Amino acid sequence: MLSRICRQTIRGAATKTVPSSKAPFYIERELKYGAHNYAPVPVVIERAKGIYVWDVDGKQYFDFLSAYSAVNQGHCHPRLVKVIKEQSEKLTLTARAFHNSVFGEYCEFITKLLKYDKVLPMNTGVEAAETAVKLARRWAYDVKKVPENKAKVVFANDNFWGRSIAAISASTDPDSYGGFGPFKAISDPNTAAFHVEPIQGEAGIVVPSPGYLKGVRELCNKYNVLFIADEVQTGLCRTGKMLCVHHDDVRPDIVTLGKALSGGTHPVSAVLADDHVMLVIKPGQHGSTYGGNPLASRIAIEALKILIEENLAENATKQGERLMKKLRTLPKEVVKEVRGKGLLTAIVIDKKKVDPWKVVLALKENGILSKNTHGDIIRFAPPLIINEKQIDEAFSLIEKTIKSFV
């Protein structure tokens, strides 16, 4: 079924491309030899710089997905390219069987920046989330004294933190977690932690009600439950603060980071917590061959410095407000809702009137690359280096596209 859908998409796209387009060759080869676990927008990207990408035919696009917010610093940031070249010529991997000369520097930098005692390095966002869950369960048995094999971790409805077995098994039953459900679940004496995205990304840029995260913090304090904030997509300046939870002035017990921690150049993720949580993990109980490697550590330090020194949180706030204001002027016949924070924004398409996938394809034709989620929601999340002129230029293309469906 997925193969047929993918091929139909490609055929449909091919009719809109020039006869000399190179894209079908690359797409067909990928479909022939690669697993069909994605249904991408039919464009083949060859190079990128800053907020722009170019396809194999040389056409330029605004990147309004940023690899799901991994490229906050912009594509191929020269400072990141420089440290990658320098470190890769010196030392790339030792595994954690030995110390290396960069990892400690990275640990000190990120823990002092985000004000946690310890960091546990991993590679992908889902690895970081699973590490956080594992930490919470170990803490529940060792510190909270939950009976063995009884510890629970509560997840928000519509959560998404990856596609591993643990991630897809996280319950999103509305009867358990809707309304007063979180209160009942957190008050269970066997509950180890509550895991939540400050803004749900894959669910469609769902921004919680004011006071929600403060309420979570208060409930977790009351019932001795760990508060885990999944900042893999929302963190690192995307929403206008270094961490999204900073908007609500709350401090989670565990924070997970990924994506923009490397500026889109290398798989790097992290779990941050204080000693009373982190030190329940003993040598040999958790780890990763690549986690904390010298190359990843050097990249992460530089990626964080870029966010700070280029004032990307402030720019995300400024340009996000500008973009949201403009998006709200789009025709209501097509766009039912606009939502977001900072430069993590989305429009909700009225799918009774317009096919959202056709909107995505039309945006591509007009020079905007984005992707829909949950069918009718199109996410707009450009690199945080975008300026006012570029926001205005990109919006004119978005507006042109949306108005073509009226």
Question: Residue locations for each model-derived region?
Answer:
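Conserved N-terminal phosphate-binding loop of PLP-dependent enzymes in the Aspartate aminotransferase
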Residues: L2-C6, I10-V406
